[in-house]
Amino acid sequence: MKDRYILAFETSCDETSVAVLKNDDELLSNVIASQIESHKRFGGVVPEVASRHHVEVITACIEEALAEAGITEEDVTAVAVTYGPGLVGALLVGLSAAKTFAWAHGLPLIPVNHMAGHLMAAQSVEPLEFPLLALLVSGGHTELVYVSEAGDYKIVGETRDDAVGEAYDKVGRVMGLTYPAGREIDELAHQGQDIYDFPRAMIKEDNLEFSFSGLKSAFINLYHNAEQKGESLSTEDLCASFQAAVMDILMAKTKKALEKYPVKTLVVAGGVAANKGLRERLAAEITDVKVIIPPLRLCGDNAGMIAYASVSEWNKENFAGWDLNAKPSLAFDTME
């Protein structure tokens, strides 16, 4: 049987990435051009800057991904691309490149939801058994997703306000930490003690919804009040207390979801899945189901995860037309 090579594109935010997946599970290349340095001075991603960077490097990323995979353009079987959610300008760059490549070579175009990509990155660890539950935690999303089979996703819980990664970055900005702040807060948290009493919103409520805005506001108020009074606060203890509150919320809701949806596998994915504190809590507290977390290199935004997610769409022959457009607010319930 002839090998299948999927060329995948990911440009939903501030990483330009192109990958090649051989058959169902052999990731031959996963080229990522990061823009973090360009956005650091702004304390967050500037959409116009992100789009410009994508345009500048995407051709080189395609060439590098093919070369690293050891294949030529003629070997590619299909093209997969993120079409949402994300920044509309950034998404359009990847869509334009993917559609151009697919059209020029007469290849099918596979539309992929960015968050489905995060979830299916777990396929790189081992074949997934369905049904399963997924906790997706990133800079833009915090969701609990029930997956009855590959490609069939249902959101069963989500944040009412800030995403968990967004809360990390906003708290980090207040403390003067470098963007993105998640990794540094995690490192500092492991050096401090949980001594500040921060709220755990809705932690005892019988639902699967998250809320981090109250926690974020409480942190900012404590920090600014101390500054106004000339008081000194331990950065390490602040980070430890903030992270403890975040993890308490995530763990409480995940446990409730596992009670409501009896599955054998929990996937934890997204940029925040790289958090050491979260991984420690999962290992200590979720012991009655298999927990699968993608490797660190596949936790952040990357085209490898888009390639993995595209396999189920390929199997269903869920191909897009040339009119496929960016959907910045795309949800699982509105996938093509």
UniProtKB/Swiss-Prot annotation:
UniProt entry keywords in alphabetical sequence: Acyltransferase, Cytoplasm, Iron, Metal-binding, Transferase, tRNA processing
PROSITE patterns: GLYCOPROTEASE
GO CC entries: cytoplasm
Catalytic function, reaction form: L-threonylcarbamoyladenylate + adenosine(37) in tRNA = N(6)-L-threonylcarbamoyladenosine(37) in tRNA + AMP + H(+)
GO MF term list: iron ion binding; N(6)-L-threonylcarbamoyladenine synthase activity
Residues reported to bind Fe cation: 114, 118, 301
Cofactor note: Binds 1 Fe(2+) ion per subunit.
Location relative to the cell: Cytoplasm
Enzyme class: transferase
EC assignment: 2.3.1.234
CDD domains: ASKHA_NBD_TsaD_bac
Biological process per Gene Ontology, one example term: tRNA threonylcarbamoyladenosine modification
Cofactors that this protein relies on: Fe(2+)
Binding site for substrate: 136-140, 169, 182, 186, 275
Function, in words: Required for the formation of a threonylcarbamoyl group on adenosine at position 37 (t(6)A37) in tRNAs that read codons beginning with adenine. Is involved in the transfer of the threonylcarbamoyl moiety of threonylcarbamoyl-AMP (TC-AMP) to the N6 group of A37, together with TsaE and TsaB. TsaD likely plays a direct catalytic role in this reaction.
Similarity remark: Belongs to the KAE1 / TsaD family.
Name of this protein: tRNA N6-adenosine threonylcarbamoyltransferase
Gene this protein is translated from: tsaD
